[in-house]
Each structure stands twice: as structure tokens, then as C-alpha cells.
């Protein structure tokens, strides 16, 4: 089984508008409300792929109850740790091919709630094969909280796919317990390394060769419409993707993480992992609903993705 972790979940509310006008009323014909936060997007896609998945993290209040009911309705197993605060809403306004997001920061977690979660997390880690951790840490938790979680995973020799950024990621990379996979984009790489990172192959190779990434088995860099660049131990790969019509890009990175996690879970080859990851990310972008893929289109798109060792 795969364990997904969402420490700062939300209800994602998507408003589709032809035109978004400031300082006036905008009326919405369609509203989509889904359990959100990066880890729950990963969860939904893994479920649609057909993998056994269990969702955990922190939930509280009426919004937390809504998320659990929604997961129950689609048959996704979950075992969250309760908190006293109210889980957040996040709003995405999709307009004229653009996306404007309004993100609530969410509840503040107490020291005791953090401690209880780590004990709960350890009990779940013992039962699963691989762990996928995604998104930001909520207020109140120390910046090295993910490091503590990865130490637990290392203790039980369980692989970890980590998708976070900023100081939380830096703390993990500076620590002794390393994730199996990280998935930064070029902007995040630039911040981590304090150097300009472009999509140029030689620049990416030099960036991924930095000491900061020692001990991380996979570094997969998202390049948007240009595909991806990856380092697996000592091998480098360029991933080229076909042009597609993008309907809703929200959650495509999370769908990519689902593909990475699924491929590791099934012990697939490097090429299969990179193709699966990018294929699921693209399938998500073709759907209105966040964290949703149409598996009927999977095989045809999978075959159009090219992976080249460089």
C-alpha cells in the first residue's frame, strides 16, 4: 500500500470564468469543490490508476469533516490525525487561459498535535510500502518537521517521494535522512542553490551535481511544456512531451508525483517511471477537475512521451 501525507489540506474551490473583472461582481456558472492540498491530489490520482492508497495528515473542523465524507464517497481510505483548528479553503479562478489562486494559510498546529501526529505517522509507516509527502507545512510546526518524518521512514527502510519547497526542503536536504525522490522546478532549484538554473541541459546537469543533493536517489526537474529533466543516481534523462490542449493545470504537478510514486511502488524501469509521471501530469491538465485523470487516454499519450539518456 502507498501512504500519502497532506499536512496542510484544504477544500479546493475552482471558479471557471470567461473574463475575470476586478472591482466588480463576477458571476460563476460552475463551481467545483474537491478535497485538496497537494497530497490529496496525489491520492486521488493513485486511486484512479488503481493503486492501493491510504491518505493521512491533519484535519479539523467542518471543512475537515467535508473532506473525509468526500473521500468516503469515492472509496479512498484515510486515517487523519485530528486538530482543534479549522482546515482551510483554497480558491482558484480560471480565466482567459490564466489561473489566479487565493490560498488561506490554514490553522496553527500546537506542539502536542505535532507530537501526536508523528506517533500516528510512525504506526502507519510500518504498514505501507512507500510514502508520498506533498505540500507546505501548516503554521506552528517547526521547519524541520519533514526531516523528522523522513527519519521515521528511514528507520523502517521505506522509500519517500517528497514534493515541497523552500526552507522545509532545504532542512531535509541538509539532514542525514534523505528522501528517495524530490521534484523541484528550475525556480526552486535556483533558490536552493543560489544560482540561476535554466532549462539548458549542461546547466541542469551542473545543478543536480551539487553536494546538496547527495544521497537523494532521484531528482526530477519539471520544465513545464518542455517536459522534464532527471537525475537517477549517476544517470541523466531528458523527457520530451507532446503539445496538448490545457484545460486546467491545477494539480498537474501532483499527478506527476502520483506517477513517480506508483512507478516506484511497482518497481518500474527509469524510462517507465519518467513516462508514467509525465503522462499522468498531462492527463490531469486535460481535465476540468483537479487531481483527475482519464485513464482511457493513458496508453496513447504514454507512447508519445520520449525519454533520452543524456
Swiss-Prot record:
Q: In which pathway does it act?
A: Carbohydrate metabolism; D-tagatose 6-phosphate degradation; D-glyceraldehyde 3-phosphate and glycerone phosphate from D-tagatose 6-phosphate: step 1/2
Gene3D superfamilies noted in UniProt: 3.40.1190.20
Q: Which InterPro entries match?
A: Carboh/pur_kinase_PfkB_CS, LacC, PfkB_dom, Ribokinase-like, Tagatose/fructose_Pkinase
Note the superkingdom of the native organism. Answer: Bacteria
Is Transferase one of the keywords UniProt gives this record?
yes
* UniProt GO MF annotations: ATP binding; phosphofructokinase activity; tagatose-6-phosphate kinase activity
Could you tell me the Gene Ontology terms of the biological process aspect for this record? D-tagatose 6-phosphate catabolic process; lactose catabolic process via tagatose-6-phosphate
**UniProtKB keywords:** ATP-binding, Kinase, Lactose metabolism, Nucleotide-binding, Transferase
Q: Does the keyword Cell inner membrane apply?
A: no
Which Pfam families does the entry link to? PfkB
HAMAP family this protein is in?
LacC
Q: Which NCBIfam families match?
A: 1-PFK (TIGR03168), lacC (TIGR01231), PRK13508.1 (NF010033)
Give the family per the record: Belongs to the carbohydrate kinase PfkB family. LacC subfamily.
Q: What is this protein called?
A: Tagatose-6-phosphate kinase
Q: Which organism is it from?
A: Streptococcus uberis (strain ATCC BAA-854 / 0140J)
